[in-house]
A protein has these predicted regions:
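A generic structural signal for short, solvent-exposed coil/turn residues
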Residues: 1, 22, 34, 58-60
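Amphipathic, hydrophobic secondary-structure cores in small proteins
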Residues: 9-50
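Short, highly charged low-complexity linear segments
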Residues: 2, 38-40, 64-66
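Short glycine-/aliphatic-rich beta-strand segments at the starts of folded cytosolic domains
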Residues: 1-9
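C-terminal structural segments of small proteins and small subunits
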Residues: 43-72
Length: 72
């Protein structure tokens, strides 16, 4: 099953986050929804949800902060 997470991140961190996710093949696909606001969307398989959450937590622990946003 496909799932999504929307996050607001610093604009200058978008490329770094994308490269981290790409280095973990099949974890998720990052799309920029609004680059000016730093709004990104990650589409991922429910199978990899725990892995994705662990990667995001590790990034936050290393200074790449984000805020998860809900649709609507």
């Amino acid at each position: 099953m496909e799932k999504t997470k929307r996050l607001i991140v610093r604009r200058d961190a978008i490329g770094f986050i994308k490269s981290i996710l790409e280095s973990y093949e099949d974890i998720g696909v990052l799309s920029v929804i609004d680059g000016d606001k730093g709004l990104i969307e990650i589409i991922y398989s429910a199978f990899f949800e725990e892995d994705l959450i662990a990667i995001l937590k590790d990034m936050k622990n290393n200074g790449i902060d984000y805020m998860e946003v809900n649709d609507g």
